[in-house]
Structures are given as structure tokens and as C-alpha cells.
């Protein structure tokens, strides 16, 4: 199993204000909520070219019922894996995550965890759940959905 400095979670934008301020929130959606564009959230980062986000075409196909969740899942994984090297220079998602984690550790920030965020609530089908499964099952890197009562119990 890959050893990381920080703990990694997934969550959704509507949950942002409940997330501890010492958790770095990383937007992994194709677009971000308007409130995030004009606010000074010190613990939120987002890149409009985010290689972890589904393509506009993939989003359109699922929203217009041209594909089902199984097809979306296959295409999303294929998209992300094909973009890793061109967007990051790394061969695998695991290598990218280790580098990202090391970079945060070298910055000597007070971050206790990283939260990958998008729009959908935990019960909805979403690419962040696919990303979490990919890290957990394929790379053996533990990432789980953020459950705040568990987190608050650990930090108090």
C-alpha cells in the first residue's frame, strides 16, 4: 500500500462549510459553483483544466440519457487514465497523488487532510465515487467519503 502524509476523502460542495478549515478541499468537477468563484476560501483549490473531471461530452451524454451508468463509468476511467500523463507528466494516478501529497508535505502547511469535491451528494451516482474506487481497488490507496461526525471525533 502507498504511504501518504495526509488522509484523503471525497465530499460535495454543499458540504463545504461543514468541513474543518484545516482540510484542503480540491474541486474535481468540470465547473465550480458560482459562490466559489467569487469567494476567498483559503482551503479550496480548483483548476479549470482538472484532469480528474469528466469531459463535457461525457457529462452531456449521461445527462441526456445517451449512456447508462455502466458506460459512463467505463468512459470516465478511460478518460482519466488517458489524461494522467499528458496533464501531469506522471505514468499513473498513484504517482500523481504521491507527488501531490509530497508537495503539500514539503510546504509544511497545517493541512490534516485533503478532500476531493464535486456536486453530487453521497447517495448519487458521481465520478468522485468512481475515482475513489479506482484509488481504493486498483492502487490500494485508501480514500473514503467524508463523514463529519467521524472526523470531528478524531480531531477533538
Regions found by a protein language model. Name each.
Residues 1-156:
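Residues lining hydrophobic/aromatic ligand-binding pockets adjacent to catalytic sites
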Amino acid at each position: 500500500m502507498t504511504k501518504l502524509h495526509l488522509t484523503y476523502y471525497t465530499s460535495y460542495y454543499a458540504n463545504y462549510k461543514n468541513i474543518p478549515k484545516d482540510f484542503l478541499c480540491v474541486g474535481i468537477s468540470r465547473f465550480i459553483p458560482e459562490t466559489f468563484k467569487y469567494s476567498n476560501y483559503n482551503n479550496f483549490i480548483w483548476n479549470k483544466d482538472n484532469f480528474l473531471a469528466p469531459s463535457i461530452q461525457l457529462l452531456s451524454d449521461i445527462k441526456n440519457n445517451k449512456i447508462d451508468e455502466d458506460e459512463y463509468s467505463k468512459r470516465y476511467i478511460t478518460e482519466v487514465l488517458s489524461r494522467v500523463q499528458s496533464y501531469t507528466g506522471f505514468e499513473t494516478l498513484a504517482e500523481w497523488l504521491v507527488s501531490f501529497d509530497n508537495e503539500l508535505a514539503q510546504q509544511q502547511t497545517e493541512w490534516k487532510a485533503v478532500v476531493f469535491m464535486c456536486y453530487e451528494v453521497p447517495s448519487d451516482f458521481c465520478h468522485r465515487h468512481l475515482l475513489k474506487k479506482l484509488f481504493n481497488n486498483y492502487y490500494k490507496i485508501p480514500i473514503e467519503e467524508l463523514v463529519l461526525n467521524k472526523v470531528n471525533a478524531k480531531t477533538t
